[in-house]
């Protein structure tokens, strides 16, 4: 099996794992999951939600996302900052393409590759990542894939 095909298979596995991780989110409008992988090891994870110590309610009475809700990417990157790991040169797998604010965090964290499975309504985050030289890959989430082929 060639290297490119092997990488594509790994990308699909990790994006499925990020999708499963998104199920931990308490947000009702949208559940997003993220994994940071380096040397084929998951070194951090995150999902969208409220900061530590806040009630796990992401939407207000008008069903709008509260302004202090953290995105999955931000949660994964801040976990790295509190650990002994480094995200320099890592790959981020995220179920929705990053917004512009998360793209800035990804760039500053030294992440070199971003794989996502769902398009966000704005493309400015993706454009910024590409402009900074980060490899950006879209892959469809294959929910019918079985690990037992």
Kindly give the residue locations of the regions a language model identified.
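Zinc-dependent deaminase catalytic domain
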Residues: 1-149
């Amino acid at each position: 099996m060639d290297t490119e095909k092997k990488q594509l298979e790994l990308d699909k596995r990790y994006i499925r794992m990020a999708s499963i991780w998104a199920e931990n989110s308490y947000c009702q409008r949208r559940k997003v999951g993220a994994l940071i992988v380096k040397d084929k090891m998951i070194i951090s994870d995150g999902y969208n939600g409220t900061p530590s110590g806040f009630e796990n309610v992401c939407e207000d009475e008008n069903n709008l996302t509260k302004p202090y809700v953290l995105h999955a990417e931000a949660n994964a990157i801040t976990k790295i900052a509190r650990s002994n790991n480094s995200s320099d040169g890592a790959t981020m797998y995220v179920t929705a393409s990053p917004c512009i604010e998360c793209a800035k965090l990804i760039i500053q964290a030294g992440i070199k590759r971003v794989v996502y499975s769902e398009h966000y309504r704005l493309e400015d985050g993706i454009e910024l990542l590409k402009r900074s030289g980060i490899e950006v890959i879209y892959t469809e989430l294959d929910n019918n894939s079985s690990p037992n082929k």
